[in-house]
């Protein structure tokens, strides 16, 4: 078992990845900014503290997810994020 450290977007997003009972998971923090992520497998993003403003690939509307809320993204897709304040998240790879 190991912990994988990741840094994206010049340090604007940092995460720690691990495997729990056969499921890949990462937890991290996003600083204010705009980010686009691609997915290989389906993902569930839960907001631990803060808010993420999300637009999934192929959709027109931006949706805000606050502390305690989550959204799911299909595999082989992408999503855009707007982050107004530093936000902690949990990403589960489904």
Curated annotation (Swiss-Prot):
Gene3D superfamilies: Jelly Rolls. One of its GO terms (cellular component) is cytosol. GO terms for molecular function: guanosine phosphorylase activity; purine-nucleoside phosphorylase activity; thymidine phosphorylase activity; uridine phosphorylase activity. Coiled coil: none annotated. It comes from the Bacteria. PANTHER family: PYRIMIDINE/PURINE NUCLEOSIDE PHOSPHORYLASE, PYRIMIDINE_PURINE NUCLEOSIDE PHOSPHORYLASE. This is Pyrimidine/purine nucleoside phosphorylase.
């Amino acid at each position: 078992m190991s912990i994988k450290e990741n840094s994206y977007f010049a340090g604007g997003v940092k995460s720690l990845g691990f495997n729990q009972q056969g499921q890949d998971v990462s937890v991290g923090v996003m600083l204010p900014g705009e980010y686009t992520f691609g997915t290989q497998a389906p993902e569930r993003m839960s907001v631990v503290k803060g808010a993420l403003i999300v637009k999934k690939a192929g959709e027109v509307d931006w949706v805000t997810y606050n502390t305690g809320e989550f959204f799911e993204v299909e595999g082989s897709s992408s999503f855009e994020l707007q982050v107004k304040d530093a936000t902690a998240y949990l990403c589960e790879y489904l």
